[in-house]
Amino acid sequence: MAASASSWRFPRAFWTANAAELCERAAYYGTFIALRTYLLRVVGLDDVQAGFVAGLFGALIYLFPFFTGAISDRLGFRHSLILAFGLLAAGYGALGRFHTMGPVSLSLLLVVLGGAFVKPVISGTASKSSNEANRARAFSIFYMIVNI
């Protein structure tokens, strides 16, 4: 059974949202891989503290979207992504500049908040950019991007 050409057509916002998700995930996983080592060697935490901070960072970035989703709906796609990537840029930029736990904690919080604004926008855009005929394909593309 061949897929119709229209089932592959999505608005530009759909593809932009998926590209944004791909960039956010690449930045998150790239940071998460090195975070514990950074906390140990640069910030000076011990193993337990570094593990706790890294685990908390990972947990919060998945918990906060439950709260930021409503705000993202009110702000809209464009403003939410601008806010999200502004927070992410500030957070990731600050991580490279500071070497004590206070500023590093604030930097990680900015990253968490930025990531929390990206997630609901992307899934909402996948839903709004699709119809009954191509919704499964839209979410398949979205989940493929998330899992790359």
What do these predicted regions represent?
Residues 22, 91, 102-118:
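Hydrophobic core of transmembrane alpha-helices in multi-pass small-molecule transporters
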Residues 33-49:
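Short amphipathic helix-loop junctions that connect adjacent transmembrane helices
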Residues 44, 76, 97-102:
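Helix-breaking motifs and short loop linkers at transmembrane-helix boundaries and internal kinks
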Residues 55-70:
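Central cavity-lining transmembrane alpha-helices of secondary-active solute carriers
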Residues 86-100:
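C-terminal ends and interior cores of transmembrane alpha-helices
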Residues 117-131:
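Intracellular juxtamembrane helix-capping segments at the cytosolic ends
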Residues 136-148:
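Glycine-rich segments within core transmembrane alpha-helices of 12-TM secondary carriers
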